[in-house]
C-alpha cells in the first residue's frame, strides 16, 4: 500500500523551483475552484479564485507544506507509531491557529487529493485504494487526537 502512494508522488514533488511550487498551488487552485464551500477555512482568502491562489505567496508556501505532509505520510505508513505521531503533529497547528475543521474533513480531504493527483497522472484503482486506506488511518488518528484534547471529533 505505501509503495503505491509513494510511487504516485513522483509526479508531485516538493521543492523550490517553479514546477514544484506549482504542484502545491495547483492543489489549492483545484480546491478553491471545485470546493468553494471550504474557502471559509482560509481566513482572509475566502474570495480568491483558483487563478488568484496560483499567484499567492501564501499558497506557494502552504502548497509546499501540504505536499510535504503527503510525502511524509506516505513514507511513514509502514511505521505506525511515527505515522500516528505525524498525524497528531498536523492537527496541532490547525488548533493553534484556530482553524477548527469539521471532523469529517480529515477524511474528506483524500478524495480531493486523489482528484488533484489525477490531474498529474493516471490514478489506477490500486493507487486510489492505497491513498484512501492511508487517509482512513490518518483521519482515525486525527479524530482520536482531537477526542483526547476535548475537541469536536
From Swiss-Prot:
Keywords: Cytoplasm, Disulfide bond, Heme, Iron, Metal-binding, Oxygen transport, Transport. Body wall globin is localized in cellular compartments belonging to the hypodermis, the dorsal, ventral and lateral cords, the nerve ring, and body wall muscle. PROSITE patterns: GLOBIN (PS01033). GO terms for molecular function: heme binding; iron ion binding; oxygen binding; oxygen carrier activity. The N-terminus is blocked. Residues 1-147 form the Globin domain. Its main location: cytoplasm. The keyword Cell cycle does not apply. CDD domains: Mb-like. High oxygen affinity. Probably supplies oxygen needed for muscle activity. This is Myoglobin. It comes from Ascaris suum. The lineage of its organism: Eukaryota, Metazoa, Ecdysozoa, Nematoda, Chromadorea.
Amino acid at each position: 500500500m505505501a509503495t503505491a502512494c509513494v510511487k504516485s508522488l513522483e509526479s508531485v514533488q516538493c521543492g523550490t523551483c517553479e514546477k514544484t511550487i506549482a504542484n502545491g498551488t495547483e492543489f489549492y487552485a483545484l480546491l478553491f475552484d471545485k470546493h468553494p464551500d471550504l474557502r471559509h477555512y482560509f481566513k482572509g482568502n475566502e474570495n480568491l479564485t483558483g487563478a488568484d491562489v496560483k499567484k499567492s505567496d501564501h499558497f506557494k508556501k502552504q502548497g509546499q507544506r501540504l505536499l510535504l505532509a503527503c510525502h511524509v505520510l506516505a513514507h511513514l505508513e509502514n511505521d505506525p507509531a511515527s505515522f500516528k505521531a505525524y498525524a497528531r503533529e498536523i492537527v496541532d497547528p490547525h488548533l493553534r491557529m484556530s482553524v477548527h475543521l469539521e471532523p469529517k474533513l480529515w477524511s474528506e480531504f483524500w478524495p480531493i487529493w486523489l482528484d488533484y493527483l489525477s490531474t498529474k497522472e493516471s490514478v489506477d484503482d490500486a493507487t486510489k485504494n492505497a491513498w484512501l486506506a492511508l487517509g482512513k488511518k490518518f483521519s482515525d488518528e486525527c479524530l482520536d487526537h482531537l477526542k483526547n484534547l476535548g475537541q469536536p471529533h
